[in-house]
Each structure stands twice: as structure tokens, then as C-alpha cells.
């Protein structure tokens, strides 16, 4: 019997109906490779192997061994490449699509890593509902939603109750997807003055991420007050005020009320 490790944030999805819904929600993948973070008890992995070849990253050696044992008994039409490694260091040489029931404690960081990775063309993941709502929020409600929608289209798909897991978590989970869009990627890459597109895209994403940290540092305060405290952007405050005037927005605007962060950041970087 496998005991969930609290240190790794393990809650295993065991409800067959929700496992099927996740697999059915995958978009057409060809020619993308499918990459999974976390093998868990193998329930989702085995269902995926009925339809796709799969590469899975798993840090827990005992779960890796259990998965290898299962595959000796349950023959699948597609092959599993099981990598015993921390997914924080996930690095693929070819374009891929990410799928995962992410550990709550590290979910945000793993999603941001995938969004930042030019090789990742999209993702379908389950996180704590609160995190999913932040990534999928419309307009500029928070920094995570701005980042997700700056590079693609983020959509909340469905909720998953605690009873679907073993052991059950204390909160609801949600499944959401982010599908990257080439036009948005080009706009992000234009923020960086480097010759190679993938490098420019990653640097552009990091530039926007850094800017948003300053803008949303105190969400209830005005954008101007937040940027005054930023070492990187306080000297550009006059240009921010110029931009707000051009956009017919008041100087008392909050970060969540900015209509177009890429437009604002481009304006700041030009001067």
C-alpha cells in the first residue's frame, strides 16, 4: 500500500469519472509529445497510455517502482518513458504538451515554468481551485491571469471535489488549460532585444513577470504607489503617468484596472 507523503503534497486522484474527464479534455496533440508531471498511483498515467505515448517526471522513487510493476502486468498500446527527477528541472528538446495533477504547494511555480518554456505549447493541469481561478481570471485581476493570457488562452474546465482523492484534501480542486498562441508569443518576444525567438520569448516573459511583481506588490494600493517602492521601476514613474494620461485612465488606478500590460511595458521600455 502506498502512503501519501505530506512533504510532497500528494493527494492521489482515484475517481474514475474525473480521470476520464481529464483525458477526454486533452486537445489534439499530433505532432506534440505528451509530458506528465507526477505519476501518482498511476491511474491517470495508465489511462493516457491507452491513447498516447507518454513521458512522465516523478520525484518519488517508490511511486516509480510501483508504476514499473504495474506496467509489467498491464500491457498498454503506447510506451511510457518514466524519468525519476524533480519536475522543477523539466527540460525538453522538442515541443510538448503538459498534463498533470499538480501538488498544491508547488503548483503555481510549475505552471509558470511551463508558460515560460518555449517548448511547452500548452497545458492541462489540476490545481487547488483558488490557484486555477487566478490563472483563468479575465482582464487584469491579478498577475497570474495577466501572464497566462499574455501568452495564450486560459480556460477553467471543471471542479473536482475532495472526495475524488485519496487522501482527500481540505479544499476543492479545478482543472484548467492554457493553450499558447503564436501572435501573443511574438508580442512577448518583442520585449527582449535578443536575436533568437525562443530566447526572446523566455526573456520577454520574465520581463513581464518581473514588472507584474512590482505592479501587484500591494494589490489594494494604487499602481503608482506600488511602483514607487520598486527599485527597477520607480525611476519610470513619470512615464507610467504619461501612459495613463494617453489611455484616459486616472493616476489613482490600481494594478487590476490596467487594460493592457504589454502596451504599458512596451511604452516604458522604449524610453
Curated annotation (Swiss-Prot):
GO CC list? cytosol
Q: Does the keyword Cell membrane apply?
A: no
The alphabetized UniProt keywords are:
Cytoplasm, Methyltransferase, RNA-binding, rRNA processing, S-adenosyl-L-methionine, Transferase
Q: Which InterPro entries match?
A: KsgA/Erm (IPR001737), rRNA_Ade_diMease-like_C (IPR023165), rRNA_Ade_Mease_Trfase_CS (IPR020596), rRNA_Ade_methylase_Trfase_N (IPR020598), rRNA_adenine_dimethylase (IPR011530), SAM-dependent_MTases_sf (IPR029063)
- Provide the binding site for S-adenosyl-L-methionine: 11, 13, 38, 58, 86, 101
**What compartments host this protein?**
Cytoplasm
User: Which transformation does this protein catalyse, written as a reaction?
Assistant: adenosine(1518)/adenosine(1519) in 16S rRNA + 4 S-adenosyl-L-methionine = N(6)-dimethyladenosine(1518)/N(6)-dimethyladenosine(1519) in 16S rRNA + 4 S-adenosyl-L-homocysteine + 4 H(+)
Q: Does the keyword rRNA-binding apply?
A: no
Assigned EC number = 2.1.1.182
- Please provide, alphabetically and separated by semicolons, the GO molecular function terms listed in this UniProt record: 16S rRNA (adenine(1518)-N(6)/adenine(1519)-N(6))-dimethyltransferase activity; RNA binding
- Which Gene3D superfamilies does the annotation name? Ribosomal RNA adenine dimethylase-like, domain 2, Vaccinia Virus protein VP39
The record's comment on protein family reads: Belongs to the class I-like SAM-binding methyltransferase superfamily. rRNA adenine N(6)-methyltransferase family. RsmA subfamily.
Q: What does this protein do?
A: Specifically dimethylates two adjacent adenosines (A1518 and A1519) in the loop of a conserved hairpin near the 3'-end of 16S rRNA in the 30S particle. May play a critical role in biogenesis of 30S subunits.
Protein name per its UniProtKB record: Ribosomal RNA small subunit methyltransferase A
Which gene is the coding source of this polypeptide chain? rsmA
